[in-house]
């Protein structure tokens, strides 16, 4: 993963992400309901990695009432999106790559919503989270599965190396007891393929791979008008449902507890 490119894309989408990220907001709401069901509250020490503009963060603060809430994101600029949260004395922000930066230990909960798919090695990160958690700590996250944005992958051959729910569970179970897991498909409808591309750009996902964009060649090379027309024609032909075209999200939700030694 080219983390620099990832950070640049999401930084550019800061002003439009909250408006366009309806699926991510829906997923965050569901994550909160699952946390309320499976994790004791209040939850004293919470780390959220990949906090973005703070959609999930605000829900965490309101619902879990942590004594300490550490927000982390790859993009330093996300701090400014969370200024209202950072006015609360128990909330702090740490920018950097969650796979490599230092986090405080003895946390009660490490959690994330719609971020893990950008990691180089979720499996190594699971091991790391186990060492950072309190002996009775929890690890809860949502990510995306192999059918996420399947329409884009089918047309361009590009996409992230998504893990299946079974692969995630197998890696997690080495360090955690899995309390709950679920996956679902969320289809979105758009007027035409151009609206799909606009949606992806406005949410920071204008390239589905960290190394390459949707475009067929180099990261900085844009499509020609003919390329764009061909993409839209194929998208319309293959993914029209009624009077609109579809884009599929494939969220996976997992709640786990640190294994007893």
UniProtKB/Swiss-Prot annotation:
Q: Which pathway does the record list?
A: Cofactor biosynthesis; biotin biosynthesis
Molecular function per GO: carboxyl-O-methyltransferase activity; malonyl-CoA methyltransferase activity; methyltransferase activity; S-adenosylmethionine-dependent methyltransferase activity
Top-rank taxon: Bacteria
Entries under HAMAP family matching the protein:
BioC
Q: Which reaction does it catalyse?
A: malonyl-[ACP] + S-adenosyl-L-methionine = malonyl-[ACP] methyl ester + S-adenosyl-L-homocysteine
What are the EC numbers? 2.1.1.197
Query: Per its database record, what is this protein's job?
Result: Converts the free carboxyl group of a malonyl-thioester to its methyl ester by transfer of a methyl group from S-adenosyl-L-methionine (SAM). It allows to synthesize pimeloyl-ACP via the fatty acid synthetic pathway.
What's its top-level EC category?
Answer: transferase
State the signal peptide span.
none
* UniProt GO BP: biotin biosynthetic process; methylation
Gene that encodes it:
bioC
Name of the protein: Malonyl-[acyl-carrier protein] O-methyltransferase
Entries under CDD domains matching the protein = AdoMet_MTases (cd02440)
Tell me which UniProt keywords the record has, alphabetically. Answer: Biotin biosynthesis, Methyltransferase, S-adenosyl-L-methionine, Transferase
Similarity field: Belongs to the methyltransferase superfamily.
